[in-house]
């Protein structure tokens, strides 16, 4: 069954800028677009022609219930262990402080365990290593700005003595800058160097470029003192060993943290959070000449997955963009991302870490596939936080997109999200039971009980309205003309049990869409053999009919063959052996007869042969059987002696589908003697073979032999029998197979295949065997059918992994190996 995502018009994420042109990436498919928190919009976009998957998050800083925070891994400097972004998100979510989204941030030194530039967390400079190339700052009044950072920080005693602070915290090994160092409450080192130590405790919150922070002096010592969650340590040595000579316990000391103007930009007052931006990529609405093109080793042209940040001209809207590097998403350079951001509202753009560090996390789950081989813990991150009070009361429903743009007479599953009064998400993929849907105008289409939108026949604009418990959600809709409307198959075989939706397709600019057969008026040349309702066929009695569907001037046709199903049907009882072709690569005495049947067998036949030594040894029964109707399984009874068991390596059935091409070759390996039944279901891991592939034909049964020479091998056979469903829900016979709905194939590339038995979504996660989640993918709501997900094995380190999938109200776990 062919299934296709519907393409939607991209809704831009801010005020358009006319100073930059977005890269020519083709049509944008907006997969998701909704608020994930107060004033925090989340958008997932797909550019199929690149191909590229991009996430854009927009923060309205005027909303009183959101903040942006810089956080150090494990709240430690240095931190050689580092921390996954999703773990930062979980760790720092508390009542009234809900992390809605998180991103990786700065480049870092593995050996030193520190970021490479100046960062500020809640008003405290964590590490000014080299200060860096640019700073993306957020002030106390929630205004963003970008500038070149030049620190000027001091400690001032009560008597007016002062000393310049050269550095904040130290790295793990060799970073030992400055003779005056302020070790903050993020310090993770055990301080042991010679010098003077002054332990201080702040009386108020910290701020940069604001009122200096007054602290109490707790201890003064020539021996090392240690920091804590509440206490900082000012360390003096060498040229500054005797600075602040009169400082005493019980006095106050003032810490002034300032950033002054450098080569570009003006540092604002009252900075609470700041992020090192490495080179400034775009500044004041255009690429920042002398900065973006002064990236070491030409890294501005390096293609990779990446995270970048931007702000609007007034600093009141902030943007974060992340991309994926995977089998389905190519690497992009920072210039293209910056131009895309400029074209969609950004004024200034800076570059965060890229490659394997890139991470976007929503609801504590990493959405992008890890680049460069595996999950990478990072040194710091960006948190988008809701500070709204906890509230689980549903006040809003939203659709997962802000605009639906689909062809006429198409089918589009709808997804609803519930939010509280602050716009914090309560539930994604809300159950649609209890919702009332309507379309305005009515000619726009209709929504069925499974929340699938059936687009009308006329090109128009309107909206879908969903309502439950007096709460409504609206989705603007535009429909478009579609070309080349046709049925995917010219002829179809159906039974009297399973309904079949006519597979109607059309395309727009080469993109194929699933269309709604219920939009057509259908006539049948033989209505007694099957009926059709809303484009769905149901067989009644054996026969053939020609269906004609009409919509205005469009006409489509389909030949339908109905074969009513019995419960079972014996296709071969071996009563007539007059036309039974046999073949062998290693036997000249091959025969089949009714002689010497096993005791208790009323019928059947015995295959007999001698085996001589030879390559590729096998014996083959070449009689062909066109299987009646749509069986769900097939069986063959046989009886094996010790000699036959030793001779047989495996038994293979060769099936072809209706077009005569090789289709399926299941193998059975016998393990015991005596009566036994080979049984196979016409399915793959519980998923019935597509109706379009029937009828199936069993072309041959091959007994593949173990090498050697043997004489008088006999294999009794009886009843090649097909089994049929007796009701639609029993299309697969559970006697013969497990009730799975997903499976992995490894022919060339690792792929997950899964079957949706009803309209819905699939939640797919990849885990290490140690229980660490690597990635999560949640599909859009899709129509019933079989879908494929490409497993990103080439981006994973060698080893065993576990894939979990939730769909159809069930969970299934599968293992796979990366070599």
Language model: regions and residue ranges:
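Gly/Ser/Thr/Pro-rich low-complexity, intrinsically disordered segments
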Residues: 21-525, 529-568, 701
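Residue-level detector of functionally pivotal "anchor" positions at catalytic/ligand-binding pockets or at interdomain
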Residues: 392, 723-747, 757
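Extracellular carbohydrate-recognition regions
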Residues: 563-589
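Short carbohydrate-recognition loop motifs
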Residues: 593-617
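Extracellular ligand-binding interfaces
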Residues: 611-690, 710-716, 726
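Glycine-centered tight-turn motifs at strand-turn-strand junctions
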Residues: 674, 773-796, 809-810
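C-terminal tail/sorting-segment detector
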Residues: 733-736, 776, 798-819
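Short, glycine-anchored, charge-dense loop/turn motifs used at functional sites
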Residues: 767-774, 801
């Amino acid at each position: 069954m062919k299934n296709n995502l519907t393409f939607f018009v991209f809704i831009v994420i801010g005020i358009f800028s006319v100073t930059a042109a977005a890269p020519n990436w083709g049509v944008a498919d907006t997969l998701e677009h909704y608020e994930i928190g107060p004033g925090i919009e989340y958008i997932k976009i797909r550019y199929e022609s690149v191909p590229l998957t991009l996430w854009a998050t927009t923060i309205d800083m005027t909303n009183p219930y959101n903040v942006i925070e810089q956080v150090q891994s494990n709240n430690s400097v240095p931190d050689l262990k580092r921390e996954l972004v999703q773990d930062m998100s979980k760790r720092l979510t508390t009542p009234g402080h809900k992390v809605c989204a998180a991103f990786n941030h700065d480049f870092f030194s593995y050996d030193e365990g520190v970021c490479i530039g100046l960062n500020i967390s809640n008003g405290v400079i964590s590490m000014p290593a080299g200060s860096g190339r640019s700073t993306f700052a957020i002030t106390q009044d929630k205004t963003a700005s970008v500038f070149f950072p030049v620190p000027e920080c001091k400690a001032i005693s009560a008597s007016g003595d002062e000393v310049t602070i050269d550095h904040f915290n130290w790295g793990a090994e060799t970073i030992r800058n400055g003779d005056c160092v302020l070790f903050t409450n993020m310090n993770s080192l055990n301080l042991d160097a010679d010098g003077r130590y002054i332990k201080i405790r702040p009386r108020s919150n910290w701020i940069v470029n604001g009122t200096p922070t007054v602290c109490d002096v707790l201890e003064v010592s020539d021996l090392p003192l240690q920091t804590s969650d509440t206490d900082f340590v000012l360390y003096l040595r060498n040229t500054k060993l005797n600075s602040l000579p009169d400082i005493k316990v019980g006095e106050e000391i003032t810490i002034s943290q300032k950033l002054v103007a450098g080569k570009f930009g003006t540092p604002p007052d009252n900075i609470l959070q700041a992020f090192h931006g490495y080179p400034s990529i775009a500044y004041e609405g255009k690429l920042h000449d002398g900065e973006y093109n002064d990236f070491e080793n030409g890294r501005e042209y390096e293609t990779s997955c990446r995270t970048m940040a931007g702000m609007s001209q007034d600093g009141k809207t902030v943007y974060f963009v992340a991309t994926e590097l995977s089998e389905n998403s190519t690497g992009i350079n920072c210039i293209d991302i910056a131009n895309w951001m400029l074209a969609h509202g950004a004024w200034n753009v800076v570059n965060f870490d890229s490659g394997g560090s890139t991470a976007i996390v929503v609801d504590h789950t990493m959405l992008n596939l890890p680049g460069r081989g595996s999950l990478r813990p990072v040194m710091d991150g960006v948190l988008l936080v809701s500070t709204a009070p906890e509230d689980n009361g549903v006040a809003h429903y939203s659709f997962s997109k802000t605009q639906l743009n689909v062809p006429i007479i198409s089918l589009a599953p709808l997804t609803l999200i519930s939010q509280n009064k602050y716009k914090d998400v309560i539930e994604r993929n809300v159950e649609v039971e209890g919702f009332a849907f309507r379309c305005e105008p009515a000619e726009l289409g209709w929504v069925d009980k499974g929340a699938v939108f059936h687009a009308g026949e006329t090109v128009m604009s309107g909206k879908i309205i969903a309502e439950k418990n007096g709460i409504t959600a609206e989705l603007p809709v535009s429909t478009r003309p579609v070309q080349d409307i046709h049925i995917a198959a010219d002829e179809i075989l159906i039974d009297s049990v399973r309904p079949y939706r006519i597979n109607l397709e059309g395309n727009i600019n080469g993109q194929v869409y699933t269309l709604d057969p219920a939009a057509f008026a259908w006539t049948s040349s033989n209505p007694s053999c099957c009926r059709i309702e809303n484009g769905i066929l149901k067989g009644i009695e054996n026969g053939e009919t020609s269906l004609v569907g009409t919509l205005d001037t469009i006409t489509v046709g389909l030949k339908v063959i109905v074969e009513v199903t019995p419960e079972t049907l014996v296709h071969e009882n071996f009563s007539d052996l007059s036309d039974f072709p046999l073949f062998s690569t290693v036997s000249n005495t091959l025969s089949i007869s009714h002689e010497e049947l096993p005791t208790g067998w009323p019928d059947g036949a015995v295959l007999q042969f001698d085996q001589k030594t030879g390559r590729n040894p096998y014996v083959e029964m070449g009689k062909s059987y066109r299987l009646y109707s749509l069986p769900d399984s097939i069986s063959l009874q046989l009886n094996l002696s010790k000699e036959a068991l030793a001779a047989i390596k495996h038994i293979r059935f060769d099936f072809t589908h209706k077009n005569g091409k090789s289709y399926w070759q299941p193998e059975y390996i016998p393990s015991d003697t005596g009566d036994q039944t080979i049984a196979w279901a016409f399915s793959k891991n519980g998923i019935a073979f597509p109706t379009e592939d029937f009828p199936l034909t069993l072309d041959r049964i091959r007994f593949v032999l173990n090498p050697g020479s043997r004489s008088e091998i006999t294999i009794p056979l009886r009843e090649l029998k097909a089994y049929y469903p007796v009701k639609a829900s029993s299309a697969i016979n559970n006697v013969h197979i497990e009730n799975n709905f997903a499976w992995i194939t490894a022919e060339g590339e690792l792929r997950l295949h899964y079957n949706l038995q009803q309209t819905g979504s699939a939640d797919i996660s990849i885990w290490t065997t140690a229980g660490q989640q690597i990635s999560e993918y949640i599909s859009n709501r899709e129509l019933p059918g079989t879908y494929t997900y490409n497993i990103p094995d080439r981006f994973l380190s060698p080893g065993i992994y576990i894939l979990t999938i939730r769909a159809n109200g069930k969970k299934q776990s599968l293992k796979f190996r990366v070599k």
